[in-house]
Amino acid sequence: MLEKTYDAAATEPKIAERWEEAGAFKAGAGAKPGADPFAVVIPPPNVTGSLHMGHALNNTIQDIMVRFERMRGKNVLWQPGMDHAGIATQMVVERQLAERKEPNRHAMGREKFIERIWQWKAESGGMISNQLRRLGASCDWSRERFTMDEGLSRAVLEVFVTLYKQGLIYRDKRLVNWDPKLLTAISDIEVESREIKGHLWHFRYPLENVPFDPENPHTYIIVATTRPETMLGDTGVAVNPKDERYHALVGNDVILPLVGRHIPIVADDYADPEAGSGTVKITPAHDFNDFEVGKRNNLRAINILTPEAAITLKDNVDFLEDLELTAELKALIVELDGMDRFAARKRIVELMDERGYLEKIDDHTHAVPHGDRGGVPIEPYLTDQWYVNAGELAKPAMAAVRDGRTQIVPKNWEKTYFDWMENIQPWCVSRQLWWGHQIPAWYGPDSHCFVEKSEAEAKAAARAHYGEDVALERDTDVLDTWFSSALWPFSTLGWPDKTPELATYYPTSVLVTGFDILFFWVARMMMMGLHFMEEIPFHTVYLHALVRDKHGAKMSKSKGNVIDPLELMDEYGADALRFTLAIMAAQGRDVKLDPARIAGYRNFGTKLWNATRFAQMNGVKLAPDFRPENAKLAVNRWILTELTRATRAVTEGIATYRFNEAAGAAYRFVWNQFCDWYLEFLKPIFMGDDEAAKAEAQATAAYCLDQVYKLLHPFMPFMTEELWSLTASEGKKRDTVLALAEWPELSFEDEDAAADINWLVDLVTGIRSVRAEMNVPAGAIAPVVVLDANKVTVDRFARHDAAIKRLARVERISFEQQAPKGAAQMLLGEATICIPLGSLIDLQAEAARLAKEAGKIAAEMDRIEKKLANEKFVANAREEVVEAERERLLELKEAAQRVATAESRIRDAS
């Protein structure tokens, strides 16, 4: 007999151990002979990471598919691993050194510091792997990989050197996102926009050959900027070619205030004639758009910042070129050189004001890009970096999606994919860090570059180049973490070696990931997979949405609305969390997570546990020779039919990535049809004297529960595994763990039995609804009068007389030609069901109660409708607040409909 309650905390570790002992998650475990492969690579979490809700959703979805396909007998591999997370890991270890008052990385030296990171990884890294196991992730943990392990590092070297020799990797001076705190280039995904209350400064730039007069607008043009310090690097002013105000000025120069540099006025579509004065100052070395304008118009790029974002003028050859060093300019250089960018901003504005160049200052709230790790505003910065020719690699990756070799689900994301790929920029792959794959480039005495897989090979290449041995210096930069991640689907399978795993599992079947890394990771895996394997890396990309809080707001520490999945698992168990995420994971829709929902789905697990316990108490046990087609009782043939239908719906739902529909179908069958109705129908049979009926009911219930454990296993693996082991045939053990049991393939259906019992369910449900709407006391028994019933319906009433009376609290059933006075009515098929209410409730009092309720609902609806009609409210209120009001309005409309139905019934009864 089962324990009275299911203890998730005690059971889950025990079940995990059982799976481990059975080798249930090993590649190919439980596969049928000659089975098709089903391979999934996990999006590698950062080695520094801890499980968050995004991981929980992502890995729940993967695990549902992996367990499902394993039970279907496929040759399954779920490949786990972790990312070395360059910046994040380096920062964690640097912080640890500071906390322990140990020498910093510069004092320690590169080699010792990297040793220290490996030591940290051995002690603390990989916590997330254990957290994923706790969630129930059925990866082949014996194959866990790390993006810095030896095999993957070899793959990285092979790819870098090959691309370099093919001319697809090169060094170039371009703008990058530069973090002046961490002193490295960072990728777009590591940049977060923050709304800042700042200013827009409007400056007067004097026209050449005209004496400058602040009072005379014909002697200058006005430009506006949010970053006055960058004006020191201005090399042009752009106007729109269609803007007639400036036609005569195009080709002339303005004089850069404070500096005295002559800079041209150029015609370029980037300038918006509708925005401000229609002119734009162009600083190619400090703005991504300006960089492109500069290239189009042959403008110089003058960098005026140090890597730490201080002003550099004194020894800045580019800045000083062609300038007349007046006493005023020399004083400016002395004052500003070495000054922090924000202090320089303040001083430049003061100087512009003093000298008559400041037109006005506007308050201006705007988005300022910050480094998500360093936390300071980033600078577009001109440096020498390594680049991949992404445009060339993108072509086959676009073709693969266009011709359907790789499908993106939901399909609407394909447009985003193509938009990105068609406008792709060179990919900056170098980072100024120590932790990561060091770039395999060595420089000779004249800076000639040798890119090889090892120092020995670089020395041999240098010897061939110079005709003698020379000292080589290795590039100190490391590769962008996304570079090694882009090789993940084939590097984890042993490439560049030709391994059996690579031959079996590549291309992989499906990739499950968040839409936010479609470009940063998915597109790059497509590029690398097609280039090096000449084959797509995956057949399907399933993009899931975000997990938000219950109001639809994005979770963030600053808002204090972060939901911790580990805490949820502590409180409700892993199964409840997983099932909640699955049933809410509708394609393309964010998951609004309310912990109350998780409590509700824990109750679903409790319902299944209690149903199994109830079954055991009534002698339900597996009958080895049970066959659905041999069942005789309509109620058994009905539940077996509904089981087949539910199995079909769950199977189709998982197979088509509609996880919410699959979970919903399982939920409805278990909670509604099996627990609420079938077990209720069985009670008189279990208590009766018909032993044959009892035996058939026991065998049917056992069979159904056995299939239910299988259907629910991908969603709720722990509880179902426990129930499976505790409900084996008497005196026997199960042949296998549930994780390796065969997925149900059911075909039994009896349309007549299903129609018959579903009619009974609809009748009882309808009568109960009317009673609830009419406020009929729960204990009151009422007669039922039936009008217009055909022979089939009359027979059904006769056949189910006892069940109707017991379940719907019906006193007697009669068939009449006319509805009795004071009766509420409902339609069921061709018949009208009348429930006389006069003797059960005070119709007048009930009518008054309903009228009052209708008034309250109408007033509340009116209030919300006025609110939503207010454009100011919709524009200024937080998105989740507006959404909550819309949802409340929908709820009220449904409530109003219910009250209107009840009022109509009262009128009919009166």
UniProtKB/Swiss-Prot annotation:
Per the record, the similarity remark reads:
Belongs to the class-I aminoacyl-tRNA synthetase family. ValS type 1 subfamily.
| Chain's role | Catalyzes the attachment of valine to tRNA(Val). As ValRS can inadvertently accommodate and process structurally similar amino acids such as threonine, to avoid such errors, it has a 'posttransfer' editing activity that hydrolyzes mischarged Thr-tRNA(Val) in a tRNA-dependent manner.
Which top-rank group of organisms is this from?
Answer: Bacteria
Task: Provide the residue positions that the database annotates as binding ATP.
Answer: K557
Complexes and interactors: Monomer.
Species source reads Brucella melitensis biotype 1 (strain ATCC 23456 / CCUG 17765 / NCTC 10094 / 16M)
Query: Would you tell me the protein name for this molecule?
Result: Valine--tRNA ligase
Ranges in coiled-coil conformation = 842-910
Q: Which GO terms describe its biological process?
A: valyl-tRNA aminoacylation
- Its EC number is 6.1.1.9
Which stretch carries the motif 'KMSKS' region?
A: 554-558
